[in-house]
């Protein structure tokens, strides 16, 4: 099995609450404990050869299985209201895409769907209510939350760039995002009409 954690491995909505809450001693101790046991039982120690880095700043991993590259994105360790992945994780991700995925298919694991409904109007309304924090984790967890939309586009464009690179091999390859979290099954497609490329998503 290959595993990646999400908020429920820590507590519901981790990373999508105000920073002063996330930084308090109670929350930080919960996070450190969850991180310790995630390393032991899911990552199975930092000796795991698939990790993109061994410095514990994030747990994104990559491996090859038959004609698929499997790239697991860590969307929790560095998450805040303002980012999904930190700069060092982006650097490791870009390096792996540039140096390793030159042909074959790509399966990207993203705990929260990249292709999903736009809740920005609802999010704007909730921001002005007294129960903002109770609903924050459900709305701000999404890639399409207003604070994450730029990073979402960065991920999509980066995947399309990799598709163009793989075209050089003259092989018919696919890029598929495998996701979950939203309690509903779905299929989605992101189209690049200019270059006739597609990214499929399965939830």
Question: Each PLM stretch: what is its role?
Answer:
Residues 1-203:
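Metal-dependent phosphoester/phosphodiester hydrolase catalytic core
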């Amino acid at each position: 099995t290959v595993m990646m954690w999400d908020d429920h491995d820590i507590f519901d909505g981790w990373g999508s609450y105000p920073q002063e809450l996330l930084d308090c001693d109670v929350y930080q101790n919960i996070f450190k404990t969850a991180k310790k046991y995630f390393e032991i039982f899911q990552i199975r120690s930092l000796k795991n050869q698939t990790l993109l880095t061994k410095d514990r700043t994030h747990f994104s991993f990559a491996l090859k299985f038959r004609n698929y590259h499997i790239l697991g994105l860590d969307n929790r360790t560095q998450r805040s209201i303002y980012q999904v992945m930190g700069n060092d994780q982006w650097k490791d991700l870009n390096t792996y895409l540039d140096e390793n995925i030159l042909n074959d298919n790509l399966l990207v694991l993203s705990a929260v769907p990249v292709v999903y409904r736009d809740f920005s109007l609802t999010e704007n309304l909730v921001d002005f209510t007294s129960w903002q924090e109770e609903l924050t984790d459900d709305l701000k967890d999404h890639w399409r939350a207003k604070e994450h939309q730029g990073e979402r586009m960065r991920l999509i464009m980066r995947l399309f760039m990799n598709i163009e690179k793989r075209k050089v091999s003259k092989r018919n390859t696919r890029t598929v995002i495998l996701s979950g979290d939203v309690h509903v099954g779905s299929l989605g497609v992101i189209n690049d009409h200019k270059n006739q490329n597609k990214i499929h998503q399965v939830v």
